[in-house]
Regions:
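N-terminal small-domain helix-loop-helix segment of the aminotransferase-like
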Residues: 6-7, 14-105, 112, 162, ...
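Helix C-cap/helix->beta junction micro-motif
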Residues: 34, 141, 170, 202-203, ...
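Conserved PLP-binding catalytic core of the aspartate aminotransferase-like
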Residues: 46-49, 308-309, 321-329
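Conserved core of the PLP fold type I
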Residues: 67-198, 214-230, 237
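Residue-level marker for buried hydrophobic side chains located in beta-strands
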Residues: 179, 207-208
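Walker B catalytic acidic pair
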Residues: 211
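Conserved core segment of the aminotransferase class I/II
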Residues: 229-309, 313-320
Length: 329
């Protein structure tokens, strides 16, 4: 890759991004410098949103004396991987702890998977609209994103025909699905999941499914796909972690759950283990704490769901019937 000369030093072109501030950045800096009270509707840090965490329990779980001993496992400590598998089993989802690989974050999970599946310049299909971070992750990992359409007229559902055409045309190294979508909030339907899995299996295209916000649906929907983990025909990687599931991003723990055809899943895990062994990025205290932390999930998520319901009702009231925006049913 061509370098970019800055003085006497050459930097990679992949890091030549636009660092210029937008129009809001200097204004926000001035207001904060002047200690002007602000209502920030873009705040995404859950530790700053007034949630009440079981602090003493969390600290107790993190104070396990066994964390003073270092015994690394590239896939993640067995006690932690089994805790993740047990949490899924509690939801009626069967997966072996041997098909779970721990990471320090979802971003790291994406990086591992891009390295596993794609060579530099290879295409990856992503939904449009989607989370802006994907573009940065793709650039850092030397893959090229190609969008597929989410139909705004049908609650941002996936255009399955377009996905089929794109797969046949560009032959992507992976298909990325986000359920619920960010920023759309739309969950993958069971019928969509089954069709996507068939399409991708027929073309030998793995699926990466981001389910980090999956626990926060505000209403029941019998057609919703609870998860893409399962014995589908396509090799599938499901991402989740503590940042969203427990609103604890500072603990830095995510995971990849691998499912699909047994031979492909086993080979994917073998290769992922080598990638993870190169970094060994997940800290020991959070892995030892994970069984206890996951037991707190119902209490923490109840607060988040209540806040989401309140915010949703307020948005619906504020939008009205003649406002500049409308709420989808």
């Amino acid at each position: 890759e061509a370098g970019v000369l800055q003085g006497l030093f050459i930097f990679s072109a992949r890091t030549e991004w636009d660092a210029a501030p937008n129009r809001l950045t200097p204004l926000l800096s001035r207001l904060r410098a002047g200690r002007v009270p602000l209502i920030d509707l873009t705040e995404s840090n859950p530790t700053r949103c007034g949630l009440i965490f079981p602090d003493q329990e969390i600290l107790r779980f993190l104070s396990n004396p066994e964390s003073l001993t270092y015994d690394p496992d590239p896939k993640g400590m067995p006690v932690a991987r089994e805790a993740v598998a047990a949490d899924y089993r509690g939801r009626g989802v069967e997966i072996s702890s041997e098909r779970i690989l721990l990471t320090a974050s979802s971003s790291e999970a994406y990086s591992f998977l891009f390295r596993l599946l794609a060579a530099p310049g290879d295409p990856v299909l992503v939904p449009a609209p989607c989370y802006p971070l994907f573009e940065l992750l793709a650039r850092i990992n030397d893959v090229v994103l190609h969008p597929y359409t989410l139909d705004a007229g049908h609650r941002f559902s996936i255009d399955l025909d377009e996905v089929g055409r794109e797969i046949a045309t560009i032959r992507p190294r992976a298909l990325l699905v986000v359920s619920p979508g960010n920023p759309t909030g739309t969950y993958l339907k069971r019928g969509e999941m089954e069709t996507l899995s068939r399409i991708c299996a027929a073309a030998s295209v793995p699926i990466i499914c981001d389910e980090v916000f999956g626990d926060y649906a505000l209403a029941e929907d019998a057609t919703r796909a609870a998860t893409m983990i399962g014995p589908g025909p396509a090799l599938t990687f499901v991402l989740n972690g503590l940042s969203k599931m427990l609103a604890l991003p500072q603990l830095k723990l995510g995971w990849i759950a691998v499912s699909g055809p047994e031979g492909a899943a086993a080979e994917a895990m073998r290769r992922l283990e080598v990638i993870a062994d190169t970094f060994l990025s997940v800290n020991t205290p959070v892995q030892n704490a994970l069984p206890g932390l996951l037991a707190l999930r119902p209490r923490i998520q109840a607060q988040v769901l209540e806040r989401l319901a309140i915010n949703s009702r307020q948005i619906v009231r504020s939008a009205g019937s003649e406002g500049p925006c409308r709420c989808l049913p």
